[in-house]
Amino acid sequence: MFYSIFIIDKEGSGAQRVPAVEAHRQYIKDRAHKILAAGATFADDGKTVRGGSYIVEMDKDEVERFVAEDPFTLAGIREKVIVQPWIKACFNGEFLITVTPPGPPDVNERLIEPERKSA
């Protein structure tokens, strides 16, 4: 099952973040096969890290361990963590949910046309 994880870090936790960065990156790299997307989120200045967000394919227990054992969590910088089940409704330019009435059943619609390569 997919889960979204949205994390807000404690205000002013940048100094605590720095020593944990390399361990956090390795932690994420080691679990990349379970992560559909991940990245930092920023304050309005576009420079100050405020947390992160992830889309992961794990069961609920794995998600809880994933968050709890993250070096940033262990460094004490997390203020709030929101975990919710997530469905892949639109991905990579495609709408993936089966159309329900009034459209025909079992039809997937494209939101954008793929780029065509010139000959």
Kindly label every feature range from the protein language model.
Residues 1-119:
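Conserved, structured core segments of small domains
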